[in-house]
Regions:
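Short acidic/histidine- and often glycine-rich active-site loop of Leloir-type glycosyltransferases
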Residues: 278, 291-305
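Short hydrophobic beta-strand element within catalytic cores of glycosyltransferases
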Residues: 265, 285-288
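Donor nucleotide-sugar binding/catalytic pocket of nucleotide-sugar-dependent glycosyltransferases
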Residues: 113-128, 132-150
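A charged, aromatic-enriched C-terminal amphipathic alpha-helix characteristic of glycosyltransferases
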Residues: 325-359
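Nucleotide-activated donor-binding/catalytic signature segment of Leloir-type glycosyltransferases, i.e.
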Residues: 212-255
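A short helix/loop element that forms part of the nucleotide-sugar donor recognition site in Leloir-type
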Residues: 149-164
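Conserved acidic donor-binding segment of nucleotide-sugar-dependent glycosyltransferases
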Residues: 299-312, 319-326
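Conserved donor-binding/catalytic core segment of Leloir-type glycosyltransferases
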Residues: 165-181, 190, 201
């Protein structure tokens, strides 16, 4: 069976989720091609087409109305040719509110033959919004990043690599900060945490970097000066809130997770976060919003959740996470992730879905 995943898995992506999944599906015996260009020009040559983020179809740039019209034509052609379309629902709506991208989300959801939900909240949300839908609804969790990261690096080794004192409670907020509210959430919660020796590890909290700035001229110079000022103040605030690069290299990422005691998910309004299964797989205690699929997973695994709009709720959750970091909660998290989110298990679940749709097409 020939599978097309409409995603440019170049190996340099900020998010390696899809390329790892594709490798896992190939290991199950399927021919898998990851390409947006193939979706645009040769989708009819495949047995199954699998979409991830609709934004990927526009190369994460703002589409023109004609681009959305073309997408609908492509989706209609797939339907006319009887080629099953699968959509993995990572988000409810686009993060940045572009109405044309939101329209593309609606088209993909409407034309999909099967919708994969990464958690129960997504499934309930979608079926409530579309009670008459006859599409196949399937729940397949987010996989962990086996084979990409060294998950056996020790806490001491991670801290030595990053220059973090061994005796600190380290709170890690990982990934991009999408807006100022996420920065305020993390910084405020950390400052209010009643812990005598604490350290905030949030390498992308500060929006300026030493290299890789998109600005030019005076704006680039100002960005570098702001980066230098924040970098100089880190020792005073017991924190690491700057990064010289826009992205953390894959080979350094395990050091950050190994160094942490608690992983803080800073999203204020989101359906999914791959950082939750990632942190669980490294055996770290996690705290995050009690919403979307994140809230359900945290409750299932015994990790504290909070209401981002309620500072007291955030404080209680972070304090509880700090206490849990001294127990076997991290070990339980790791065992849970390995049992439920292993790439082999998740890839096999997708393989079963492909077979189900392919067999249905032939009947």
């Amino acid at each position: 069976m020939k599978i097309l995943i409409a995603y440019t898995a170049s190996g340099t992506s900020d998010n390696p989720c899809v390329r790892l999944l594709a490798d896992g599906i190939r290991a199950c015996g399927y021919e898998v091609v990851c390409s947006v260009e193939e979706f645009r020009s040769n989708a009819a040559d495949y047995d199954i087409v699998h979409l991830q983020w609709p934004e990927e179809l526009f190369r994460w740039k703002a589409p023109a109305p004609a681009d959305v019209d073309t997408l609908e034509q492509q989706l209609q052609t797939l339907k006319n040719n009887g080629i099953p379309l699968i959509y993995t629902r990572h988000n409810t709506l686009p993060h940045h509110g572009n109405p044309l991208v939101a329209e593309a989300y609606g088209l993909v959801e409407r034309y999909a033959d099967a919708i994969v939900h990464l958690g129960d909240c997504s499934l309930r949300e979608f079926t409530a919004a579309h009670p008459d839908s006859e599409q196949l609804q399937v729940m397949i969790p987010h996989h962990i990043y086996e084979g990409l990261y060294d998950m056996d690096i020790t806490r001491d080794a991670g801290r030595r690599a990053l220059g973090i004192p061994a005796d600190r409670l380290v709170v890690l907020a990982f990934g991009a900060f999408r807006h100022a509210e996420e920065r305020r959430l993390v910084w405020g919660a950390f400052r209010r945490l009643h812990y005598p020796a604490k350290f905030l590890l949030a390498p992308r909290l500060w929006p300026y970097t030493r290299r890789g700035s998109r600005f030019k001229g005076l704006k680039r110079l100002a960005g570098r000066l702001l980066y230098a000022a924040a970098h100089s103040a880190e020792g005073f605030f017991d924190s690491r809130i700057t990064s010289p690069e826009p992205l953390i290299p894959d080979e350094q990422l395990p050091c950050y997770l190994a160094a942490a005691d608690v992983v803080f998910i800073q999203r204020t309004d989101i359906l999914n976060s791959g950082n939750v299964p990632l942190a669980l797989s490294f055996g770290r205690v996690v705290t995050g919003p009690a919403s979307g699929n994140i809230g359900g997973l945290l409750a299932e695994t015994g990790n504290p959740a909070f209401d981002p709009a309620d500072p007291r709720s955030v404080d209680i959750a972070l304090e509880r996470a700090a206490r849990l970091s001294a127990t076997d909660q991290g070990a339980r998290n790791r065992a849970y992730a390995q049992e439920h989110f292993g790439i082999g298990r998740i890839a096999a679940m997708y393989g079963g879905l492909y077979e189900r749709l392919y067999d249905g097409k032939r009947q």
